[in-house]
């Protein structure tokens, strides 16, 4: 009975083990496999012991030692099993953003007319998604792609025409590709300064086509292309051959892609975009131009007031990094046709988002009249530098004309083979040289005129615009401009509404003055050489001699000291009004009145050498070897009593 009790106890103990009922079935290798196709089966002892994980070992090798497989232990009796891990949530696509009607037209037009957006996964919808995410991260607020940019109607630029679509364009008018937008989002800056030349450069022959038959609209675009042809080596051919070409559409606003993308690419010149400045601006993007105010050194030239920008659009004011910049050694240009205006993306027409560090340029930035001299110089440097092999010594920032290599292309206001002379005009001249007296220049008319001021002694020129009356606008389109840098290649101060410059000083020894107007305009400017005239020693006083040439003395010179009989003065005797004999010279003590009480340094007496110590003078005093007598400093005489 004892044996039976022990056996039952052991059996019950086994049943209560936690893993008794949870043991997994034996693995597949525990069961004998199928027989070999021929021959007798192997001896039974060959199958003893489990093989390692994987297929059974070859029959001609002994199996590896058996290892106990890991058991899945269950929790102790009475505790519930742990809950299963939560299933991963299914990936949900971002909600589809509803476009406004105007934006929907733009997106469809870009996708349809630009081949780069027809590749799988690279539609312009994807660009907008990346841009929205980037702007949300930059601003910390929700970016609304349907934002309408306020327009005061006084700016004649692409921002005014794009008020309903600017929020889906990078920097208001650039339709970037997915690759370009990813670089911006990842790095926070773009690839090049104003030129995007990483494998996306056009040849010098660029074909283009029109999608609209409006003759006047086509003529205005052709005029903009001819402006580039006259000033660069680039040529545009209507309906020219080639798989890569520009497509001009009359779309919703003004926009363009940047650089050569491959295949057809759209440039939209919609209503309000048909001016020379805006057309050349958008074509400039297609040629590779970025915006000027995004240069890496821009903080030395402009201040960005992000607090005045529309919420969510702060990312539209990024600048680039020095690590990937190609500047071609050209200076910052306030007058570039690619520069933002002062109120770009502003909350209000009374707030500036972009302000020049030098406030004199506030009416210069945002130019949409025509490309500046430096805009054209940059294009010629990028596209045409290998045309003129001969070196020509151009002055004042000029460069060899790619359309005539024996001639310099000169900054506005200069001309000549080497840019050495003032540009010819009916109303401008070389002004009288600036000396140390103020001179005035005034003008009234409606022509393009040029003047130049040069200092007489090689110094700087100080000038002041005292009166201005041109057609007034926040960004001057008709203006008087003053170029005062060492080189005259960069755009100068432009004024049109009122004289606010105050006195300015040129960096070099000359100033160029340019007037551009189509209606009667006036200005008044004064100028002089900076500094004061060098001090010259006055000639000695000459006394006219009688006909007998008797010897007469000149007047006494100024006393060398102010008091105390400490100073001397002299005079010369002349034989004529032009020939004084220096040997005939008289000297005397002067200014004999006593010096006031107080502390004084030792002075050199006229009768004794230096008095080197400080003396506290309680009363009026005289220099050494002089004594105060009756209010006058007189020489000390031995044995003589001097009354006070």
UniProtKB/Swiss-Prot annotation:
It is found in: Secreted. Zn(2+) binds at residues 281, 285, 291. GO terms for cellular component: extracellular region. Disulfide bonds join 233-384, 254-273, 388-408, 410-419, 559-590, 563-595, 574-580. Residues 421-546 form the CUB domain. Residues 40-70, 75-94 are annotated as: Disordered. Its main location: secreted. Binds 1 zinc ion per subunit. Its cofactor is Zn(2+). One of its GO terms (molecular function) is zinc ion binding. Residues 1-16 form the signal peptide. GO terms for biological process: molting cycle, collagen and cuticulin-based cuticle; proteolysis. Pfam families: Astacin. Keywords: Disulfide bond, EGF-like domain, Glycoprotein, Hydrolase, Metal-binding, Metalloprotease, Protease, Secreted, Signal, Zinc, Zymogen. Transmembrane segments: none annotated. This is Zinc metalloproteinase nas-33. It comes from Caenorhabditis elegans. The lineage of its organism: Eukaryota, Metazoa, Ecdysozoa, Nematoda, Chromadorea.
